[in-house]
């Protein structure tokens, strides 16, 4: 037992998934007590946090506390805890059994979500499972009033947000009772409720809650109470998360509290929330608990390092076993209102913590000539090879081989008796086996290649892992307008300090900070946090003097509420501070920013507008002119300042730091005899030159060569990182297998950052919110190097565009030129997709291209929205631009581009065709595309500065060869499979498969697929395809090319780079004059959105990969002279050999998002009667096809509606005995209740009160179930 103490202890606890960390502040002791326990160890204790407190109390009170007895609390001042109970329950889907209650007509709303697929190349379309087991619909409906609605009958009601509404269907409680009883009979007593427009009219949700509780439900989560913000889908998902997790949390907390005397009634107990604030047990709920542990780490590094150890903004880097959390701090916590965790959207204030699937457990693989790290993890069981459980090689194994992990300082908890150290021998053996494979491959590429050693291979994998973790750090900083290199890296977590120097150097950072408690910083951070009370309500108004007076009134009410809640917890006025926020957006955009109030010059009021404009310009790079600011929400935050832990200074250093011993550690260039120091034996002012190891408890801090570690006044480690001074020299005549992976990451990262720049700086809904764009970089010959995975129909297609421009302009390209094109004959898809191309020169020589393609909402043509269903010639579809320099020698050619867009050429026999109806939006989005290209250029130039132009261009070629190899291997495998299943298909070395399908007009897509089994080459011969059609579903050749490259990438099913190499072993033959290679005059608007889907179905059917999907994008446009709206509607995906097709999702060649139902009704004159799955529309089979969707829209004013769709005649086919999916259908229901079939392509003038009903196709089934 230790010395008996006077006073009371303070406990900070982080109950993680694997370990529970306990930090206790002991009265009279200069240092805290640190304890690390297994979170689950049932043979020794029931609960790790309780056990940690028990052990520490025993040690410092001198009293034995039996595990079976309650723990005395007379020596406990407070307990603060973060817990992964909620996170684990969400990840493992082990929450409470719950049901969902929704407005009638929206039973499937949360399952559909925004329609988007999580991974566009995953043919199984794996989506997270629903949290709810059952759904019940309540008969009620609230409708927002239109601006010109009168109130003759006095039926208008003013909602919480200030919007006027009508209750068109009162709450039907009697009808709901039997449905609730049915849930109780099934053992479900927890309910999540989301009703349409409850953010502004919560009464019906409250009626549901009252009735449910009266009938015996244990817990009800109301979306309107949890997050009163417009958008039903994220609000509803948040309610399901809360209903799913809160009972689990309450049960755990109740069990924890019951282990103490008096149920901790006299001890202040607080729990960490996702927003970095503490809350008492009574206010700790599921939707605010998911980031409980990571939030403690952010509080920990921000409150102990920023301002004390550095003035630079900090990047938090928390590397664990399976993932790494990245965050940022610059004097205030960066928060988001909405994020996605474990595949589920949560809408609540939370710290902006980005997670990447790379950690100590990330698997190491050598595939297709490149090193790959993750995203799969070996997990805690069996873990890495060194854990002695038969695991696979992981990052931890690489660190062990290099000497970054020291077995002497790692707990001996492995082996059958859990008493063995890490297994170095087994790890080396596994690496030696892998080295054999790698060196055989390298010799096959270059007979003179020298064998790589185990250490070189391990270092290579660590380098690739570091680059994987650098990508989210660059994204976190640069997408918000910050320079990454101007930050310091705050490193914590078990594995982070081993990688910190290398990551900082790669990012251009000069400073790394490692907290003295880095291994338990999340626990330590609990003691630095304040109690937070948040309150928010919707308010919809134009920002201005009149609305601000209402804002201040609402703020006053909300501030009173949070103050009262804090006062109830014992906070006096002197310990309470408050913050106010407005959620603001520009009119016509969906991009809202939560703006913290700042005092005006005279201190009399908060000037939210000025702060919004500043933040908007910083994040998006521009300001919008002549646009109103709209208020969305009013929010206040009450802060109860607590008695936090205080940083303690350490003693000044003796003359020479004590070296414990030396170890061999492998760095770039070879082995180094490296001294090891213990942090506990180092003092303020000690300086340690790298290479060195500093042991900090269970954390290993690696100080690399050319770095210097300094012990600070507070006992933390500051590492000065010497930046790379010269470019890296690599051989250009052969690809280095490590650098190949790193360049893959760098090239893809550049394309992704271009995409984020375009999304940030664009203003149109199509680009900014629906994400209908794509960005890429190209080698000097126009070959695709990297294409970020945005919209599949754009993938690979831009290479044809770049090469056409290269041929067209020839020597007439100059530095400072930017090209624009959208014409199908110039490699375009359809006219709304405008491509901006920037050639880049070095010393007068063309060295690469960057390009961005975005869907512009308007480019002219015979109908608003430029998507006419009945166009017969290209000139009817809008402005068609083959080649134009939108920037010439650095000067933006506004007059020229305006002329092209506003005065498109038309056929001489026709009347004039209208030009674009939104020229300012076109100009703004073109400038956004130019900015995205410029971002790509600057990033590639940084790469060239680091490696040299020759090396970068060489690796532009090598990444293409790498992708080519992957596709060749896949084609060989497919050929062998097909020939074994159907021997007659093989002649010699070749396998031949023929497939065809029919468009709704009877046109044939015919494919003869021939695969050379030896060479891994394929011919896609579309000879036999029908001629050009007198309609608009002709598809330019680039569309078919995009469909083929998409299919190949899906079939490879490995995260290879998407580039020109994917098409290198492929020949695509398209007969000229067919509707897949139409004439220059052909109408093509439907080819991109309809025919592309049908080509994809034919290709995947030929490969026997999966049954046909819905085969359509179900394009809907409507509007009048004052507005326009465009959407694509999902459907059913085809089933495959081992999976059912996914229902109600965007399939294959698109992945654009659906507008939330509440936003849809708020901004447009519509009433959405139904949006749900079209049950049983998927084809039956051994594996069932996915169901399509039903969408019923009532128009509340006269509009012109256009529908452009396919699969209304021919059904999506099943495969291998699977049945066909149901074909789609489009109907107009008139005011006199007639149901009129519209066919697949039509334009109709709709009157107020008429309803459009769209039934999208289901997917085909796979395999016979007979």
Swiss-Prot record:
Pfam families: Hydant_A_C (PF19278), Hydant_A_N (PF05378), Hydantoinase_A (PF01968), Hydantoinase_B (PF02538). InterPro entries: ACX-like_C, Hydant_A_N, Hydantoinase_A, Hydantoinase_B, Oxoprolinase-like. GO terms for cellular component: cytoplasm; cytosol; plasmodesma; plastid. It is an enzyme of class 3 (hydrolase). Keywords: ATP-binding, Cytoplasm, Hydrolase, Nucleotide-binding. Its EC number is 3.5.2.9. It is found in: Cytoplasm. Expressed in roots, stems, leaves, flowers and siliques. It comes from the Eukaryota. Its main location: cytoplasm. The keyword Membrane does not apply. GO terms for biological process: glutathione catabolic process. Disruption phenotype: No morphological phenotype, but high accumulation of 5-oxoproline and decreased concentration of glutamate. Transmembrane segments: none annotated. It catalyses: 5-oxo-L-proline + ATP + 2 H2O = L-glutamate + ADP + phosphate + H(+). One of its GO terms (molecular function) is 5-oxoprolinase (ATP-hydrolyzing) activity. Catalyzes the cleavage of 5-oxo-L-proline to form L-glutamate coupled to the hydrolysis of ATP to ADP and inorganic phosphate. Acts in the glutathione degradation pathway. Belongs to the oxoprolinase family. This is 5-oxoprolinase 1.
């Amino acid at each position: 037992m230790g010395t008996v103490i006077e006073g009371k202890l303070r406990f900070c606890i982080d109950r993680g998934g694997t370990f529970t960390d306990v930090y206790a502040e002991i009265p009279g002791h200069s240092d805290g007590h640190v304890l690390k326990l297994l979170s689950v160890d049932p043979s020794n204790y029931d609960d790790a946090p309780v056990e940690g407190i028990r052990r520490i109390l025993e040690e410092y009170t001198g009293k034995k506390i039996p595990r079976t007895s309650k723990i005395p609390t007379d020596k406990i001042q407070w307990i603060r805890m973060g817990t992964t109970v909620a996170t684990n329950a969400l990840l493992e889907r082990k929450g409470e059994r719950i049901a969902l209650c929704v407005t009638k007509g929206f039973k499937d709303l949360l399952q559909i979500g925004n329609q988007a697929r999580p991974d566009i190349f995953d043919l199984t379309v794996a989506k997270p499972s629903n949290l709810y087991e059952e759904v019940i619909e309540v008969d009620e409906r609230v409708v927002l009033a239109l601006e010109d609605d009168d109130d003759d009958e006095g039926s208008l009601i003013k909602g919480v947000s200030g919007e006027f509404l009508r209750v068109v269907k009162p709450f039907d409680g009697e009808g709901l009772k039997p449905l609730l009883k049915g849930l109780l009979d099934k053992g479900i007593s927890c309910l999540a409720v989301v009703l349409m427009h409850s953010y502004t009219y919560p009464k019906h949700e409250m009626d549901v809650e009252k009735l449910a509780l009266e009938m015996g439900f244990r817990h009800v989560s109301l979306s309107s109470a949890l997050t009163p913000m417009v958008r039903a889908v994220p609000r509803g998902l948040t309610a399901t998360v809360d209903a799913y997790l809160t009972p689990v949390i309450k049960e755990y907390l109740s069990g924890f509290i019951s282990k103490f005397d008096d149920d901790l009634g006299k001890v202040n107990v607080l729990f960490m929330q996702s927003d970095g604030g503490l809350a008492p047990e009574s206010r700790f709920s599921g939707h605010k608990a998911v980031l409980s542990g990571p939030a403690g780490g952010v509080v920990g590094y921000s409150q102990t390092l920023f301002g004390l150890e550095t003035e630079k903004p900090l990047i938090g880097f928390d590397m664990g076993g399976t993932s790494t959390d990245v965050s940022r701090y610059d004097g205030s916590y960066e928060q988001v209102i909405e994020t996605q965790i474990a595949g589920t959207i949560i809408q609540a204030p939370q710290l902006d913590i980005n997670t990447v699937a790379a950690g100590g457990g990330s698997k190491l693989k050598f595939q297709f000539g490149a090193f790959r790290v993750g995203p799969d993890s070996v997990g805690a069981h069996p873990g890495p090879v060194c854990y002695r459980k038969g695991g696979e090689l992981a990052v931890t194994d690489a660190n062990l081989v290099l000497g970054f992990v020291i077995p002497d300082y790692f707990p001996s908890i492995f082996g059958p008796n859990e008493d063995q150290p890490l297994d170095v021998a087994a790890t080396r053996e596994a690496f030696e086996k892998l080295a054999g494979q790698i060196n055989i491959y390298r010799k096959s590429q270059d007979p003179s290649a020298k064998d790589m050693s185990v250490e070189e291979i391990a270092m290579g994998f660590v380098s690739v892992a570091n680059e994987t973790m650098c990508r989210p750090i660059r994204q976190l900083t640069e997408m918000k307008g910050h320079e990454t290199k101007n930050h310091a890296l705050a490193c914590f977590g078990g594995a982070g300090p081993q990688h910190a120097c290398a990551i900082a150097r790669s990012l251009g950072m000069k400073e790394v900070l490692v907290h003295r408690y880095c291994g338990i910083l999340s626990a330590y951070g609990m003691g630095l946090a304040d109690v937070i009370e948040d309150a928010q309500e919707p308010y919809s108004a134009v920002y201005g003097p009149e609305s601000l007076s209402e804002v201040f009134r609402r703020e006053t009410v909300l501030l009173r509420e949070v103050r009262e809640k804090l006062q109830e917890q014992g906070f006096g006025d002197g310990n309470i501070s408050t913050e106010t926020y407005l959620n603001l957006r520009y009119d016509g955009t969906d991009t809202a920013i939560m703006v913290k109030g700042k005092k005006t010059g005279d201190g009399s009021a908060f000037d939210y507008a000025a702060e919004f404009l500043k933040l908007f310009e910083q994040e998006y790079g521009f300001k919008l002119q002549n646009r109103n600011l709209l208020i969305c929400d009013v929010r206040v935050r009450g802060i109860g300042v607590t008695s936090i832990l205080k940083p303690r200074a350490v003693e000044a250093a003796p003359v020479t730091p004590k070296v414990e011993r030396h170890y061999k550690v492998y760095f770039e260039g070879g082995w180094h005899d490296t001294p090891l120091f213990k942090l506990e034996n180092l003092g303020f002012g000690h300086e340690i030159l790298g290479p060195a190891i500093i042991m900090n408890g269970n954390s290993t801090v690696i100080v690399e060569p050319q770095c210097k570690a300094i012990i600070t006044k507070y006992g933390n480690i500051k590492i000065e990182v010497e930046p790379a001074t010269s470019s890296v020299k690599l051989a250009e005549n052969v690809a280095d297998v490590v650098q190949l992976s790193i360049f893959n990451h760098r090239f893809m990262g550049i394309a992704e950052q271009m995409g984020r720049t375009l999304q940030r700086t664009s203003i149109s809904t199509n680009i900014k919110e629906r994400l209908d764009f794509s960005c890429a970089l190209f080698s000097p010959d126009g070959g695709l190097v990297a294409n970020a995975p945005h919209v599949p129909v754009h993938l690979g297609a831009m290479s044809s565009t770049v090469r056409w421009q290269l041929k067209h302009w020839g020597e007439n390209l100059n530095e400072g030129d930017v090209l624009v094109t959208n014409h199908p004959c110039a490699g375009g898809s359809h006219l709304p997709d405008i491509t901006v191309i920037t050639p880049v020169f070095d010393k007068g020589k063309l060295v690469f291209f960057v390009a961005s393609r975005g869907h512009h909402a308007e480019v002219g043509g015979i109908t608003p929205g430029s998507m006419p269903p009945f166009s017969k010639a290209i000139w009817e579809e809008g402005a068609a631009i083959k080649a134009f320099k939108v920037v010439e020698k650095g000067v933006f050619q506004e007059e020229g581009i305006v002329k092209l867009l506003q005065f498109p050429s038309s056929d001489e026999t026709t009347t004039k065709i209208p030009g674009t109806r939104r020229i300012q939006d076109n100009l703004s989005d073109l400038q956004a595309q130019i900015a995205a290209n410029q971002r790509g250029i600057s990033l590639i130039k940084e790469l060239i500065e680091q490696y040299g132009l020759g090396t970068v261009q060489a690796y532009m070629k090598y990444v293409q060869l790498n992708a080519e190899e992957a596709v060749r291997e896949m084609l060989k495998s497919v050929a062998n499979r097909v020939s074994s299943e159907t021997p007659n298909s093989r002649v010699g070395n070749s396998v031949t498969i023929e497939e065809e399908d029919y468009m709704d007009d009877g046109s044939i897509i015919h494919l003869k697929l021939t695969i050379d089994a030896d060479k891994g080459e394929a011919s896609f011969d579309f000879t036999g395809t029908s001629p050009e059609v007198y309609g608009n579903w002709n598809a330019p050749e680039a569309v078919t090319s995009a469909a083929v490259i998409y299919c190949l990438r899906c079939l490879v099913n490995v995260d290879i780079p998407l580039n020109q190499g994917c098409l290198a072993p492929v020949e695509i033959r398209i007969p000229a004059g067919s509707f897949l290679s139409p004439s220059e005059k052909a109408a093509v608007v439907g080819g991109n959105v309809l025919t592309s889907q049908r080509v994809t179905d034919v290709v995947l059917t030929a490969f026997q990969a999966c049954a046909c999907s819905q085969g359509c994008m179900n394009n809907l446009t409507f509007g009048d002279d004052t507005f326009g709206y465009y959407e694509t509607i999902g459907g059913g995906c085809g089933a495959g050999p081992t999976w059912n097709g996914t229902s109600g999702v965007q399939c294959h060649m698109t992945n654009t998002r659906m507008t939330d139902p509440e936003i849809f009704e708020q901004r447009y004159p519509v009433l959405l009667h139904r949006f749900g799955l079209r049950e049983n529309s998927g084809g039956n089979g051994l594996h069932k096809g996915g169901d399509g969707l039903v969408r019923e829209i009532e128009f509340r004013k006269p509009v012109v509606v256009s529908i452009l769709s396919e699969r209304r005649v021919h059904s999506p086919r099943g495969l291998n005995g699977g049945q066909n999916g149901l074909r789609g259908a489009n109907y107009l229901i008139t005011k006199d209740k007639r149901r009129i079939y519209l066919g697949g392509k039509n334009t109709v003038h709709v009157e107020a009160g008429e309803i459009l009903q769209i039934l999208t196709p289901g997917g085909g089934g796979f395999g016979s179930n007979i």
